[in-house]
């Protein structure tokens, strides 16, 4: 069973979507049979497309393209009368018999081979087709390979063993394969965008390695304490395995929470990624314990690689020290102020964030034919060519007065600010619905284009009162504006839901009011800094070439929502793994400072390793040619760095030192009604200890 991914990002029932459906219904005869591709030509220097020789070359190429049985029709530039003012640029339109997703690679290769004729003749020839892509936008597996290699190095240095480093990679790949297979099969039944596969691969690989890391780390601790292999496997699965299940559930909840936005493609992304995370969790708690039982003492802490031992200095006198934790604890106020101030400064660009959707002009490299076609069309017709608007004018009657009113409305629309050109009103078969095409002066992401769409919709109020004619706007630019608006409206609701859920969840886990509050505020700090950094590099264009972005452009409209859903789960994971140990020590000793010191020493190293592994996987995806995947990879890399290293490893211990015993305050009445949640399975340890104590007493 093959895959059937969709690349269209759309939201049903937006104003632009409704207008588009009216056009489809009323102007059926004008609708293309299938996908359309523009073949853009630029004449050689000192020549025009009107030259007989140039026209002959173009005609030959178009005839060759027509030979493809999948092609329905081909319209030449002269036929469409679309030459630029200087007659040097024009485009042909190739219409296929099938929709974009059904256009085969063979058909794409056919058209790519055909245009080599005009290219060889010195006529620049480029292709652009909306949902029909000709340049390779896949990650080709290289991004995953880079991430896995870096993760392997981090694991090898963490555990001082190549064998131990390989186990999390192995189980993560198994989980990833299961998740990917499930998503690919799912595309045959529901609409799933191809970017969902990349997002799921990112998360599935990262959490798969991290979750295995936590369980293996606990297994080795038990072996070091003298437990047998079966006991160590059981305890590691019961304790760290329980924490992994909790961690996985928080990530899954965050991803499934994307469905509250009621945006279909976001829901599909969330469900796809959640399925892969679920596969990673199941492999970690089912398959990994079996593998640990097989390798047994071969991965015990004493079995260290000599080469890595020399490089890391493992086993030397400072091996058990925690210099960073000690530094933070000695200067908590200064560290807190500096860390919060740093994140606040990095967050500043967030306040001028401009959301948009991908276009060939902002997401494609100049090495791609789509981007070169985009630039040629811009050169010929201006930025507004890519932001064409279709206005639907609806009347209740089909009379001569209606037609006159429509013509008047078309002229009035032409007088609106930033309008480059307007076509006459074209009547539909019913005589009640007219279509008016508007070309703005500005591009699809320009605020002036957004203002123009708003002005047309505002004018509808006037025409309804005066002529009983409703105006509706559609077109790619209008669709994008509506999608961005819908996402912007969903963002605060989704953020409030996630933050509220995180607070309640952590109150249950830590039985404290202030620690969850600190965790949530830390999450908001890291989120703000992440979006600030992404705006600085992607939207403002600073050093964008270093990161491989072809041009500065708006932030992907759905990136903030996705980032909140994913970062919520990861942030809560780090908080739980770090603070759970602190709570355990505080419960036994009542000493808040000792709890923080021991928590940082015991859990800090694993949290750092987990953060580095996450970052290595996400950095790998920043190497992807597709700027959508690249921007998601960048955002998640910054998000993990800020949250794991600045918030959890710096601000959390510093603030907890300042709070002292009050950090663990919980009203007695609330303590009585809250259920006890044993995230790390410590009750298992207590039962084992009690059992061993009884055996010891019996043998005395």
Task: State each model region's role.
Residues 1-3, 71, 87, 97-355, ...:
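Membrane-embedded transmembrane helical bundles of large multi-pass transporters/channels
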């Amino acid at each position: 069973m093959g895959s059937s991914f969709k690349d269209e990002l759309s939201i049903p029932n937006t104003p632009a979507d409704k207008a588009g459906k009216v056009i489809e219904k009323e102007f059926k005869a004008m609708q293309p049979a299938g996908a359309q591709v523009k073949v853009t030509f630029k004449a050689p220097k000192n020549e025009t497309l009107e030259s007989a020789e140039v026209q002959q070359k173009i005609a030959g190429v178009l005839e060759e393209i027509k030979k493809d049985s999948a092609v329905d029709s081909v319209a030449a530039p002269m036929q469409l009368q679309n030459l630029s003012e200087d007659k040097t640029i024009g485009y042909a339109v190739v219409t296929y018999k099938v929709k974009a997703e059904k256009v085969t690679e063979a058909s794409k290769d056919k058209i790519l081979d055909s245009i080599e004729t005009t290219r060889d003749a010195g006529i620049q020839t480029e292709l652009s087709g909306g949902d029909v892509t000709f340049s390779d936008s896949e990650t080709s597996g290289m991004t995953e390979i880079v991430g896995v290699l870096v993760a392997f190095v981090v694991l090898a240095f963490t555990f001082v063993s190549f064998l131990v480093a390989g186990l999390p990679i192995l189980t993560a790949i198994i989980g990833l394969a299961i998740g990917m297979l499930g998503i690919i099969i799912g595309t045959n039944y529901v609409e799933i965008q191809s970017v969902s596969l990349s997002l799921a691969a990112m998360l599935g690989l990262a959490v798969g390695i991290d979750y295995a890391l936590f369980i293996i780390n606990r297994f080795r601790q038990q072996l070091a304490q003298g437990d047998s292999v079966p006991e160590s496997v059981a305890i590691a699965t019961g304790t760290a395995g329980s924490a992994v299940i909790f961690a996985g559930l928080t990530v899954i909840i965050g991803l499934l929470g994307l469905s509250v936005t009621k945006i279909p493609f976001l829901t599909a992304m969330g469900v796809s990624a959640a399925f892969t995370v679920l596969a990673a969790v199941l492999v970690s708690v089912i398959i990994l314990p079996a593998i640990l039982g097989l390798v047994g003492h071969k991965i015990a802490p004493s079995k260290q690689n000599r080469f890595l031992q020399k490089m890391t200095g493992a086993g030397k006198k400072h091996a058990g020290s925690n210099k960073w934790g000690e530094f933070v604890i000695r200067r908590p106020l200064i560290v807190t102020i500096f860390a919060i101030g740093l994140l606040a400064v990095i967050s500043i660009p967030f306040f001028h964030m401009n959301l948009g959707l991908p276009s060939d002009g902002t997401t494609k490299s100049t090495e791609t034919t789509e981007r070169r076609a985009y630039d040629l069309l811009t050169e010929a017709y201006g930025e507004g060519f890519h932001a064409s608007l279709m206005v639907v004018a609806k009347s209740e009657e089909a009379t001569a007065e209606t037609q006159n009113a429509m013509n008047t409305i078309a002229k009035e629309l032409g007088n609106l600010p930033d309008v480059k050109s307007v076509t006459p009103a074209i009547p539909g078969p019913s005589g009640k619905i007219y279509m008016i095409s508007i070309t703005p002066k500005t591009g699809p992401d320009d605020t002036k284009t957004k203002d123009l769409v708003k002005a047309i919709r505002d004018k509808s109020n006037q025409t309804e009162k005066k002529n009983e004619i409703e105006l509706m706007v559609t077109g790619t630019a209008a669709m994008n504006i509506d999608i961005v608006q819908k996402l912007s409206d969903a963002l605060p609701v989704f953020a409030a839901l996630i933050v509220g859920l995180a607070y309640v969840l952590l109150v249950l886990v830590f039985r404290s009011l202030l620690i969850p509050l600190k965790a949530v505020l830390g999450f908001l700090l890291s989120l703000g800094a992440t979006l600030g950094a992404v705006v600085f590099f992607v939207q403002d264009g600073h050093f964008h070439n270093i990161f491989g972005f072809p041009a500065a452009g708006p932030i992907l409209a759905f990136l903030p929502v996705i980032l909140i859903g994913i970062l919520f789960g990861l942030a809560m994971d780090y908080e739980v793994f770090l603070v759970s140990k602190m709570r355990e020590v505080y419960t036994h000793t009542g000493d808040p400072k000792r709890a923080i010191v021991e928590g940082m020493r015991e859990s800090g190293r694993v949290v750092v390793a987990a953060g580095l592994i996450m970052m290595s996987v996400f950095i790998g995806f920043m190497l992807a040619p597709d700027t959508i995947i690249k921007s998601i990879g960048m955002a998640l890399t910054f998000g993990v760095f800020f949250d794991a290293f600045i918030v959890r490893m710096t601000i959390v211990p510093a603030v907890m030192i300042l709070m002292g015993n009050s950090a663990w305050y919980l009203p007695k009445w609330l303590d009585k009604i809250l259920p006890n949640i044993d995230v790390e399975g410590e009750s298992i340890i207590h039962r084992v200890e009690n059992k061993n104590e009884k055996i010891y007493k019996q043998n005395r």
